[in-house]
């Protein structure tokens, strides 16, 4: 490689081993979308205002950039304290991102803690809730995050009742496997599993574990 240029840094540096980065994808609009993890394995390591809910912190967010690293003029406005490029927040660990080629919408998969793994549709300005809203449990006993004034949380399109640990995400639009056409393929870390999730009109109509 030559003329390498840094467009984005997932600052600040931390010693955590979990959920440092996340999915990266170019959207149909030509913009670059980058997910960052919250990095906490135990929720009590959050400050009073959890990292993923703090618009001045890069952790637990999704960012939207122009290909040259500049900030699009039509990005949502989170206020003067917000980190640059912020597009959505309330993310724990969004490792998979893909495009539904039928609609052009970006979907992302997200790790829960104790269960609570999710599929979401990315929307400008949306707050996906972590850690204040989750379909799973917490690893920290008796943990209760501080309320975030005025926050409106977006529910997931789909969540698994048992742990899947979704990593990666692909929308299959090919013809070689017609029964899989227009489905999301989700690999799971917890058991080395593979799931097929079929949707219509942005709603899940079936979910099956392939192996």
Positions of predicted regions on the chain:
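Loop/turn elements at helix/coil->beta-strand transitions in domains of secreted/extracellular proteins
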Residues: 4, 29-32, 102-104
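Beta-propeller domain segments
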Residues: 38-208
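Aromatic- and glycine-enriched pocket-lining scaffold segments that form the walls
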Residues: 20-39, 60-61
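Multi-bladed beta-propeller domains
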Residues: 6-9, 78-79, 210-211
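Asp-box/WD-like beta-propeller blade repeats and closely related beta-sheet repeat scaffolds
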Residues: 1-25
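Short, flexible loop/turn elements at secondary-structure junctions
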Residues: 8-11, 28, 91, 101
């Amino acid at each position: 490689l030559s003329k390498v240029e840094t467009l984005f840094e997932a600052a600040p540096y931390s010693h955590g081993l979990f959920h440092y980065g996340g999915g990266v994808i170019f959207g149909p609009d030509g913009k670059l979308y980058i997910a960052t993890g919250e990095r906490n394995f135990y929720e009590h390591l959050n400050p009073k205002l959890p990292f993923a809910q703090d618009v001045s912190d890069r952790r637990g967010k999704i960012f939207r950039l122009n290909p040259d690293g500049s900030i699009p003029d039509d990005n949502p406005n989170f206020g003067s304290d917000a980190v640059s490029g912020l597009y959505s927040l309330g993310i724990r660990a969004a490792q998979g991102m893909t495009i539904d080629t039928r609609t052009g919408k970006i979907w992302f998969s997200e790790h829960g803690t104790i269960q609570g793994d999710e599929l979401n549709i990315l929307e400008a300005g949306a707050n996906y809730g972590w850690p204040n809203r989750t379909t799973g449990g917490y690893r920290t006993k008796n943990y209760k995050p501080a309320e975030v004034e005025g926050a409106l949380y977006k529910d997931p399109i789909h969540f698994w009742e048992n742990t899947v640990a979704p990593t990666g995400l692909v929308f299959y639009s090919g013809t070689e496997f017609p029964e899989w056409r227009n489905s999301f393929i989700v690999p799971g870390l917890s058991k080395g599993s593979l799931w097929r999730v079929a949707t219509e009109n942005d709603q899940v109509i079936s979910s099956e574990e392939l192996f």
